[in-house]
A protein has these predicted regions:
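Structural alpha/beta core scaffold segments of enzyme domains
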Residues: 1-349
Length: 349
């Protein structure tokens, strides 16, 4: 209601008419006397500058004016197509002359390829090419992990070619990482003071002064977790005539466009991203590393060849950018009425 009134006020100010003469209806603000109208988007900046109405100033709609509330189910544009298997997800893309790619990535983040049997991969029927993908420099920061892409006429040939590579890796600095030992260190750190992000009062004193039996302590561990999206990452890239076109299930198409433009040294306006149904994202598909991988492989193929780069479920679990591992320790004082009187929360992540 507050946003509606602010939009109406912005429109009235533009038209220099009393706000009582305008009305927000179905994504527009109308001036019925003259037939003038503004879309909400046209008014958004001006509306944001309006004074936010106080609770007592809000004008709620009469139920007779409701368009959706109480009117039964609101239809979904693509629900029927999804239910019938007719909707297009990233894995569904089919283009003339398309080839398929999978990537052998290092088993440890930051690892480097030591050797691989490229000839064995190329002997697999249907395999067309082996393309090297350089690893990142500096922090990983959601960049491609590097490795060897096997390009083939179908995904089966690509995965069989990848298996034939038999890659050997140098694990690098992260090779000694061990999650159990890291958890023990987090459990140690979470019991001692650290950087304070918020403090109100003296929680530590309240805990020490609390009567016996009134202090409750709990500790929680969140391990490395893959996002495990229903559809693993997949992207198709075609480069032709100084332009690139992308078909992918992505949460951040602008990031995908910019990554491809940077990789191929193109202007952003020369990269088109077709956003397909997501198949689950959970934040994972806000990062365009898999689209970047596809653009690297497409660049190595004859111009105009559409390349679909596929992550298998195994790729997704092993090479996902995992959720942050953390240990959370909470201590609280609960009074006789069951109310929280003090709360201390420490996090090691």
């Amino acid at each position: 209601a507050a946003a509606r009134q602010m939009l109406e006020a912005a429109a009235a100010a533009r038209w220099s008419v009393p706000v009582a003469e305008v009305q927000a209806v179905q994504h527009e603000v109308l001036h019925r006397a003259t037939g003038r109208r503004f879309g909400f988007g046209e008014l958004a900046v001006d509306a944001a500058k309006q004074k936010v109405p106080a609770i007592g100033e809000l004008r709620l709609k009469d139920p007779a004016q409701w368009h959706y509330i109480g009117k039964g189910r609101v239809g979904s544009v693509d629900m029927a197509a999804i239910a019938r298997g007719q909707a297009t997800f990233g894995m569904d893309v089919r283009l003339p002359g398309m080839v398929y790619a999978v990537v052998a990535r290092p088993p440890v983040v930051g690892g480097k390829l030591r050797s691989a049997d490229r000839d064995a991969a190329l002997k697999v029927p249907g395999v067309l090419k082996v393309v090297e993908i350089a690893g990142f420099s500096g922090a990983a920061a959601f960049q491609p992990l590097g490795g060897l892409a096997v390009v083939a006429r179908n995904t089966w040939a690509a995965t069989q070619g990848r298996a034939a590579l038999n890659p050997q890796w140098d694990d690098g600095a992260n090779g000694s990482y061990e999650s159990v030992a890291f958890r023990r260190e987090q459990e140690r750190l979470v019991k001692v003071p650290g950087t304070v992000y918020r403090n109100s009062g003296d929680a530590a004193k309240a805990l020490s002064d609390a009567p016996a039996g009134k202090v409750f302590t709990a500790e929680y561990y969140v391990p490395h977790l893959a996002h495990a999206t229903m559809e693993p990452p997949v992207a198709t890239v075609q480069i032709q005539g100084g332009k690139a076109e992308v078909w992918t299930s992505i949460q951040n198409p602008v990031a995908a466009r910019d990554a491809v433009a940077a990789r191929l040294k193109l202007k952003p306006e020369n990269v088109k991203v077709n956003v397909l149904l997501l198949g689950g994202g959970f934040g994972r598909k806000s990062k365009p590393d898999f689209v970047d991988e596809a653009s690297i492989v497409a660049q190595a193929m004859p111009e105009g060849t559409p390349v679909k780069l596929v992550w298998t479920r195994e790729d997704d679990i092993q090479h996902d950018y995992l959720h942050t591992v953390s240990v959370e320790r909470l201590e609280a004082v609960i009074d006789s009425q069951g109310q929280v009187r003090s709360w201390l929360h420490r996090s090691a992540a």
